[in-house]
Amino acid sequence: MSGNSTQSTPTTSNSLPVNLDLLNHEIIACVRCPRLIAHCRKVGEIKRRAYLDWDYWAKPVPGFGDPNARLLILGLAPGAHGSNRTGRPFTGDGSGNFMYPILHKAGFASQPTAIKRGDGLELIDAYITAAVRCAPPENKPLP
């Protein structure tokens, strides 16, 4: 993230989406962890056979959903061929295939599937993010 993070920002609900949008742009542009950035890019170049025709996201994955949500879902890190490929948390992998139908049934998702960014999925009163924003090698972040 940029070095300007010491600025105070308004915390009213009206300003929250703007601040979250700014944070997500900073996350996407982040290059603080050379090991993780290199791994994300490498995975994006050396693709799984099933995804050879995909243009991998291959950069830090921002959060997704309703900025004023009452439900926060926190994952560990993006999957190398899931979120690192699609650019959206829990999208395009087994964990998303399990989670999104449940969220849809509970009224937190507009549809039961999550294939890629721009597929029409919207979260309702829910926000999904991860503790680590880049797919780590062997799915194991360092402390």
Where are these regions (language model features)?
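A polyanion-binding, active-site-adjacent surface
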Residues: 17-143
